[in-house]
Regions:
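A short, well-structured juxtamembrane/interface segment
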Residues: 12-31
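Glycine-rich phosphate-binding loops that contact phosphosugars or nucleotide phosphates
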Residues: 30-171
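Flexible inter-domain linker/hinge segments
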Residues: 1-12, 17, 172
Length: 172
């Protein structure tokens, strides 16, 4: 519960996602018409949850790709594509390669990362730190939970910036 609190509470104000403390500009969310989530392992499963959240809430198409396959599939990326890289450590080699490809091809990039100053955090346009602390469980339950929360916050911000939900829907 503490990890979820640390991820969510500083970023919700009056029912709206607020990334100002993270220095994440609303501009990254403007005009997004497609989201690609890339990750490995547990983080990939959090991406699947995020896909359902975004598609159900705001009807933007989302694909979730294993980072190990992303760079080999020749993805179509442009300035209207938001690539979300999810990683606990911020150092996963395949996720870093996927991020670099997204950056090279002009996509907007944001990472959901636990470890401050990691390679993926440094190379992303923006980073949403989960502040989860070290993972004790082998099953990576804490990391999964906060990564899902991060995806929910991104969904809320996409909805708000692109006027895809009413204020009442946002507060629900």
């Amino acid at each position: 519960p503490e990890a979820l609190h640390n991820t969510i509470m500083p970023r919700i104000h009056n029912g709206h996602a607020d990334f100002s403390a993270d220095n994440i500009s609303d501009d990254i969310f403007k005009g997004v018409n497609r989201v690609i989530v890339t990750a490995c392992g547990t983080a990939w499963h959090a991406g699947l949850v995020g896909r359902h959240l975004i598609e159900a809430m705001i009807r933007i198409p989302v694909t979730v790709e294993l980072a190990s396959e992303f760079r080999y599939m020749n993805p179509i990326l442009d300035e209207h594509t938001l690539v979300v890289v999810i990683t606990q450590s911020g150092e996963t080699a395949d996720s870093l390669a996927a991020l670099r490809l997204a950056n090279e091809r002009g996509a907007k990039t944001i990472s959901i990362v636990n470890v401050k100053g990691s390679s993926i955090a440094r190379e992303s346009d923006y980073v949403l730190y989960t502040h989860a602390g070290p993972e004790i469980a082998v099953a990576s339950t804490k990391a999964f939970s906060v990564q899902c929360a991060g995806m929910y916050l991104i969904a809320l911000k996409l909805a708000e910036v692109n006027n895809l939900m009413t204020d009442e829907q946002m507060k629900d």
